[in-house]
C-alpha cells in the first residue's frame, strides 16, 4: 500500500513538472509570460509614425540631392538608387526622372521592355 501511494505521488509530481515545462515552452514561443529579463534583450520597434524617417532625413548631410526614398546623396534626382535593388530594376525615363519597378520574369531588362510597351500604349 505504501509503495502504491509513493508511486502515485511521484507520478503526480512528474506530471506537474512536465506540465509546467510545457507551459513555459509556449510562453517563450508566443511571447507570453512577462519575464522581465527576457524582454530586456529584445530590440525595440521603430515608431509607427514618420518620426524615425524625419529624424534621419533631417540629420543627413548632402551637398547635392538627397534621395527621399533611400537617403542617398546623388548629383541629380534620376541617379537615386532603388530602395530594394535585389527585387527592383531602375528605369530612367526620357524627361530626367526615373522609376523603380519590380523585376520581370526570367529575361534581363524585361521590366524595362514592359515600361516601354506601356508608354506606347501597347500593354
UniProtKB/Swiss-Prot annotation:
Keywords: Signal. The keyword Signal applies. InterPro entries: LCL2. The keyword rRNA-binding does not apply. Residues 1-21 form the signal peptide. GO terms for biological process: ERAD pathway. It comes from the Eukaryota. Belongs to the LCL2 family. Probable component of the endoplasmic reticulum-associated degradation (ERAD) pathway. PANTHER family: LONG CHRONOLOGICAL LIFESPAN PROTEIN 2. This is Long chronological lifespan protein 2.
